[in-house]
Amino acid sequence: MKRAKQPTWTLSVGEWANATGNVLSLCHPDWRGVREAAYSHQGPVLETHDAAEDSAGIIEAMKQASLSVLVVQGFPPGSSELLRSAQRGGLSTRVVLHSSMAQHGTDPGESEVADTVMRLAAEGVINKVGFVKKGQAEAFTALGHTAHYVPNGVPELAPFEPLALGDDGLQVGIFAEPLWRKNVTTQLGAIALLAPARAHLMTMPTNTYLSDLEVVEHGELPYAEFVRLQGSVDLNLNVSLSECHPMSPLESYLAGVPCLMSRTSDLFKSDAQLWELTTVGEADNPSAIAAAATALVAKRHEAVDRAQHWMTSFDPIAKSLWEDFVS
């Protein structure tokens, strides 16, 4: 991962001073879901590629702006150094992890981050640790590492004009990198069963047996362009093998587009009908995904209405859990 040579702060000290409250969230500008999660909590956010690059300057700026709580979202490079600086500076510190235990067991990078965070918490460098994935905080606490459930808030979408993607078949978005847990290849297999359909992707997997599919590869898009594209398709697929509290499905439903998910997060689970309509149990079965997608598209208006109602009900819960976490 390349590190920026110069600080990449997106907020000035003056803007921080205008903030209500005493909390500053920090995130990596290129980690899209984590970034949107940070902004979902409404407070000031600092984006940086390397949290250690000017840690002393960040801490001093926070003090000048009367921001006394630092929340690191997703643990960007340099977070350990920044958190130690914050501790020395008398600030209260928090870390929110957006990974799952499944990732900790298979991804060396995520494993190292989780172990580092728990070690820093044991040393008193981090005052509270949170997980956006429901069920993990209880497990870590049982293992001797006190943790809290801190789900993401509901994002806010700016108005946009939908793109004209064509009316010659179902336009389906799979906006995830082809990593093992994102399950992109399986979902492309499902799209073959939805024909006529066109897939819209970030990056096409290298499997040559997929070459007959109609695919548009869009690459990594700026956030506003991504939201516009995601909100212009007929259906989005987010059928991953491991998930935490994904933001893309929420953005999709806010834009009026149904999104099929796996049952690896607790999104919509409190509404049994919505859960049944918007999720699929067999995440590694393209036929099951295609069948669930067909059923979802047939009831897209009901799904969108129920999802938006769910978000309206859930957001105060997320806000309350966040306030408890940062207090």
Report each predicted region and the residues it spans.
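Membrane-proximal helix-turn-helix segments that form the acceptor-binding/catalytic region
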Residues: 109-128
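Aromatic "clamp/platform" in nucleotide-sugar-dependent glycosyltransferases that forms part
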Residues: 241
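Conserved donor-binding/catalytic core segment of Leloir-type glycosyltransferases
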Residues: 162-182, 188-192
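Short hydrophobic beta-strand element within catalytic cores of glycosyltransferases
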Residues: 258-264
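Active-site proximal beta-strand in glycosyltransferases
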Residues: 69-71, 86-105
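A charged, aromatic-enriched C-terminal amphipathic alpha-helix characteristic of glycosyltransferases
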Residues: 283-287, 297-327
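N-terminal pre-catalytic "stem/leader" segment of glycosyltransferase-like enzymes
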Residues: 1-82
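Acidic anion/phosphate-binding donor-loop and adjacent secondary structure
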Residues: 105-106, 141, 149-169
